[in-house]
Regions:
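Residues embedded in well-ordered secondary-structure elements
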Residues: 15, 96-98, 152, 248, ...
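Positively charged n-region of N-terminal signal peptides that target proteins for export
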Residues: 1-5
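Bacterial N-terminal signal peptides
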Residues: 8-20
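Extracellular protease catalytic domains of secreted zymogens
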Residues: 174-403
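N-terminal zymogen propeptides
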Residues: 23-178, 185-195, 199-201, 234-236, ...
Length: 403
């Protein structure tokens, strides 16, 4: 069957290639990548007072959706580039086969809305890449199944498939929340889901929580930071897709590891060349309201008195996903669950986000460790410098060491 990528991903959802799609100029570098149109779903467009996801879709036009897109990164190709597995020269997408096999404790993904085909899609994705099914459970944050929200199933598929791909031995929870759809919510229901996610992870041996959503920073955001402090849990959050200078919460919270976005440059043969900042995409900057945490004292000359994000980064574009058909998706929505899974697979779980971040910045302060444990991202924007920067933090993962 020949269908468009967007149509396959949005089957049953009120968005098609013929619709008028708003593109956020700050979210992406233009409206195409590798010659393909970028589609920013409604749920990924920032609006005041509304949480949004951080992903976009690559429209490959009419193509067969019964196999992964040939230019979409796979678990094996990404793991090869980041030296998480024994790889082949060039880490080509087509021939990289070795996938991560680790994972400890639990991983909880926080998303909005029900995803009816989650288990089937996760199984299909895993089978395609030689990944065992593992232990997967869907939890309703308030005890009741939420409605299906337009476009959020793509986010949920991306999150669970890639967290599981990086750490298949970890128990995986998908915590589904309702959304606040009016101005009458005292507290967005998503925060209850974050609380539930932390409790689930803590009860299952500790681990990580990944959040691929956010909202533009606002003056009262600090009152919600306590939701990311459950003992035994490290929280990861997307830094946003608004480019440098656009910071979001919870990504700006000092209680999360903020994950920014990069891009793999490949040659005409599909071999990896280098990694750069995803220009105009990965969110980063200095928080408007969060004070600089002590673990960032090592970069105080850069960030001043406020929190700087991201802390780390991972590939931003683009990932193979399965949602009743294969597609290609990008954004820091991919970066966050990927990095969370890598930390789980590293097997040295910390007792809190602060402990994880303290370790990361201590390693950054040690030039030898920083070079050994992270890829310093210095290309893609004039603000990408040697060392920590608002492009990619301390860098992207290099092996499991120091994670």
């Amino acid at each position: 069957m020949r269908v468009s990528l967007a149509a396959s991903l949005f089957a049953g959802i009120a968005l098609s290639l013929g619709a008028s799609v708003s593109l956020c100029s700050a979210q992406i570098n233009g409206s195409t990548i590798n010659g393909h149109r970028i589609i920013v779903p409604d749920s990924s467009i920032p609006r005041p007072g509304r949480i949004h996801t951080n992903y976009f879709i690559v429209d490959s036009g009419a193509r067969n959706n019964d196999a992964p897109p040939p230019d979409a990164e796979t678990p094996a190709s990404l793991a090869c580039v980041y030296k998480l597995v024994k790889g082949t020269k060039g880490c080509p997408i087509a021939t990289s086969k070795n996938v991560p096999t680790g994972g400890v404790g639990a991983i909880a993904i926080v998303d909005a809305g029900d995803y009816p085909t989650a288990k089937q899609d996760l199984h299909t994705f895993s089978s395609q890449f030689g990944i065992p099914d593992g232990d997967f459970q869907i939890v309703y944050a308030d005890g009741h199944k939420p409605p299906v929200y337009s476009n959020w199933e793509v986010e949920e598929a991306l999150d669970i498939e890639w967290a599981h791909a990086m750490a298949p031995k970890a128990k995986l929870f998908l915590v589904e929340s309702k959304l606040c759809t009016s101005n009458k919510c005292n507290t967005d229901p998503t925060w209850q889901a974050v609380k539930v996610a932390g409790e689930l992870v803590a009860k299952n041996g500790g681990g990580v929580v990944s959040m691929s959503f956010g909202d533009a920073e606002w003056a009262q955001e600090r009152q919600f930071d306590h939701y990311m402090t459950t003992p035994g849990v490290v929280y990861f959050a997307a830094s946003g897709d608004g480019g440098i200078g656009f910071t979001i919460h919870p990504g700006a919270s000092p209680n999360v590891v903020a994950v920014g976005g990069t891009f793999f440059n490949r040659d005409s043969n599909g071999d990896f060349i280098n990694e750069q900042y995803y220009t105009g995409g990965g969110g980063g900057g200095i928080s408007l309201y969060e004070p600089r945490p002590s673990y960032q004292d090592v970069i105080k000359k850069i960030v001043g008195s406020k929190r700087g994000i991201p802390d780390v980064a991972s590939d931003f574009c683009c990932a193979a996903i399965y949602l009743q058909g294969w597609g290609e998706v990008g954004g820091t929505s991919w970066s966050s669950p990927t990095f969370a899974g890598i930390v789980s697979a590293a097997g040295q779980l910390k007792k809190s986000s602060k402990d994880e971040l303290t370790m990361i910045y201590k390693e950054y302060a040690n030039k030898q460790q920083h070079k050994a444990y992270f890829n310093d991202i210095t290309q893609g924007d004039s603000r990408c410098k040697v060392g920590w920067d608002v492009c990619a933090g301390v860098g992207s993962p290099k092996t499991y060491a120091g994670k």
